[in-house]
Each structure stands twice: as C-alpha cells, then as structure tokens.
Regions:
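Phosphate-binding and adjacent anionic-ligand microenvironments
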Residues: 1-4, 10, 18-211
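Catalytic core segments in nucleotide and nucleic-acid processing enzymes
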Residues: 15
Length: 211
C-alpha cells in the first residue's frame, strides 16, 4: 500500500519531469512555476520541485489553503491583464503562457492525506483528475519497463529516502478545545526558545507569515 506522500511524490516527479521533457518548463521560466503543499506533507516533494528550479509554497493543513493560493495567483495575474479580460475564458495553454510570463504557474499540489491537484481549474482536491494523473504516470513508468515501486526507488536514489510517520494527539470536548486554544495562544505570544536541550533557531507562524 502506497502512502499519500509516496503517491504525491510519484505524481509530482512524473508531472514536472514530463513538462521539462516537453519543453514547457525550461531553465528560463521554471522559477515562475510552483508546487504547493501543506506543511505537514513530506519535504521530498519540495526537494523534487527545487531540483527542477520550481518554487515551493507551504500552506496550513487543509486543501482549502492550496485553493486560496490559486485564487491569489489568479488575482495577481489578472491585475496586469487588459481591461475586460476574463480568467475563465482563457484556454489552458493561454493560462500557462500567461503565468509563466508574468505570474506563477501552478504545476502540482498535494497533501499527505491522499489529496492531489494538477490544475487550477478546480480549487480543491480532485479525485477524478488525480486518478487520471496516476494512470498516466503508471503508463509512463510501464513504458520505461518499471513499476511504480521501481519509479519511487529511482526518486529515492536521487533525493534520498524520506522516512515518514503520522501521529495525532486527541483532545476531546470543550475542555480539549479550550486547551488547544491556550496552547496556540502561548506559542504565538511566546515562541519556544528551546526544545529540551535543542536551541530553536526560528519560528514560523503559518497563519500570519507570508507564504
């Protein structure tokens, strides 16, 4: 069974490398392309994107925050568009060219809980499109004579193996909710300077900092 992170890395690498092979992404324009992920999602996706020169944007947990970034990129692009231009009227190749020319071209988005997106036409996790992306990536791997597991091994041989583990702390009821609020407030008002004997170099507030 593949984890959500493994599928995301498989799709991200295949999608980015395919766009590079097709000449859509080049060394000149890759800096205007981006991969968006939630900050609890594996950093292997970031390593893959950085290898190809793409920007990496981390968001709060939840796919709606990825959708918010896509809306932001649309608004930024249309702020420089001719009067009367409509984003929804643009064809996919026109959107891509515009974003790569003066905006931020969204290549892939994902989170570890099996949610993926390869286009900004949908602003939430898209199971239908994800299934098509996975089928295409599997076909691409098969054309190379390898399995999905083999493809992942190729990724690990380049970027190293990223060990992952999911865990959760459950605080139930009104008392639990109040405790969560107190903890969050304490972290924001007085960020920790050390964890055990390890010094904290910096703290990032994903709810306020520019991502």
């Amino acid at each position: 069974l593949l984890t959500g992170n493994q599928i995301g890395c498989f799709l991200a690498h295949y999608r980015i490398s395919t766009l590079v092979r097709q000449g859509v992404l080049t060394s000149q324009n890759a800096g205007r392309a981006c991969l968006i992920k939630t900050f609890v999602t594996t950093e292997l996706q970031a390593a893959i994107a950085n290898k190809f020169g793409l920007k990496v944007v981390n968001t709060l947990t939840g796919f709606k925050y990825i959708g918010e970034k896509l809306r932001e990129y649309e608004e930024q692009l249309m702020s420089t568009a001719p009067p009367g231009a409509e984003y929804g009227a643009l064809q996919p190749h026109e959107k891509r060219a515009a974003h790569l020319g003066r905006g931020c071209f969204f290549v892939f988005g994902g989170e570890e809980s099996y949610g993926y997106l390869g286009t900004d036409d949908v602003r939430d996790k898209d199971a239908n499109a994800s299934a098509l992306m996975f089928a295409e990536a599997m076909a691409g791997a098969r054309a190379q004579g390898i399995s999905v597991s083999d493809y992942l091994d190729k990724i690990y041989s380049i970027f190293g193996f990223y060990w992952e583990k999911l865990g959760q702390i459950v605080l139930e009821g009104a008392e639990g909710s109040a405790k969560i609020s107190r903890l969050l407030e304490s972290y924001m008002s007085k960020p920790p300077v050390a964890i055990g004997e390890i010094k904290v170099e910096r703290c990032e507030n994903f709810a306020k900092d520019t991502l």
